[in-house]
Curated annotation (Swiss-Prot):
Belongs to the major facilitator superfamily. DHA1 family. MdtG (TC 2.A.1.2.20) subfamily. InterPro entries: MFS (IPR011701), MFS_dom (IPR020846), MFS_MdtG_subfamily (IPR050497), MFS_sugar_transport-like (IPR005828), MFS_trans_sf (IPR036259), Mutidrug-R_MdtG (IPR023692), Tet-R_TetA/multi-R_MdtG-like (IPR001958). This is Multidrug resistance protein MdtG. PROSITE patterns: MFS (PS50850). The keyword Membrane applies. One of its GO terms (cellular component) is plasma membrane. It is a multi-pass membrane protein. It comes from Salmonella heidelberg (strain SL476). The chain crosses the membrane at residues 19-39, 56-76, 90-110, 113-133, 144-164, 171-191, 222-242, 254-274, 288-308, 317-337, 376-396.
Amino acid sequence: MSPSDVPINWKRNLTVTWLGCFLTGAAFSLVMPFLPLYVEQLGVTGHSALNMWSGLVFSITFLFSAIASPFWGGLADRKGRKIMLLRSALGMAIVMLLMGMAQNIWQFLILRALLGLLGGFIPNANALIATQVPRHKSGWALGTLSTGGVSGALLGPLAGGLLADHYGLRPVFFITASVLFICFLLTFFFIRENFLPVSKKEMLHVREVVASLKNPRLVLSLFVTTLIIQVATGSIAPILTLYVRELAGNVSNIAFISGMIASVPGVAALLSAPRLGKLGDRIGPEKILIVALIISVLLLIPMSFVQTPWQLALLRFLLGAADGALLPAVQTLLVYNSTNQIAGRIFSYNQSFRDIGNVTGPLMGAAISASYDFRAVFCVTAGVVLFNAIYSWNSLRRRRLAIE
């Protein structure tokens, strides 16, 4: 029996990719708490300049990731997903190391852009697992995998803040690079993939990729859904601490309260994603998606009327539980409507839409709060999610009618 004929232990691959997503999520969020402080340390002074550069170095990573994702997705479909995981982990480790050595803001900005260009560990992990797991377990597997990145993103800021306080800002980048290198080693030694490389001539072109989809309109609507999910999440991020301060009044531990309220949706998503993914395997991911979107709307509206931080925390916890089902449901529907041959590109296109949402969401939230007030952000976000629920329901209904 040749190595390519040996059955893949997809459960082991799921465990290792979960750990890889956890380490990647932690590595990315480790540096987030002090990003503006590092920008200041690199010589940027003045309130407006500091705000502008902090926004630029944050958003440029997502922007370049959105541009690069389709290219890496195509390469994954040609060369395999494991090699893309290795490329991403090692590339990001090297860039993080260089970030700790940056001498001025321009070097740091270029390195943040390079981080976006070389990223893509999580979408490639999703594509790898989606092509190996039995179809009837896709929802559970992708829901479980999503908790890896969420867990890392939750613990990262806490660990990053503690490390920065004890060792300074630059050493945190070196520690982050080490974490990403561990991710590279885990992937190299423990992930297995049976993949026959495809020549460039045999690769499907974009038009052929679209033609091979079972329902191209539905897949496009799922990409839009991913974008809107990230817009809805990101729109609240810039104003959350200020909104909590408005609700709490003059208290000494505002940073702790804000941090707790910021993290509760992630905790809820961590608990709900595998369970709702399993439920989606039983009743259908499309039902989970629509119900979760409607619940999100019903939770966002009262957030604009809360009177205390704890009311906001409770609503955000419930919102996180609903949101935990959204991206895994989208990814499961993408698996159902595409073939393994194009999985890398489909998941990379989805990642591009996600990155665009990560850039536009905070901009939308900041613009609305500047023009109106903090409470208006929740109402407008609820409207955007409601549009998404109607749009998604209509796309799924058309698919059902076409099948019938």
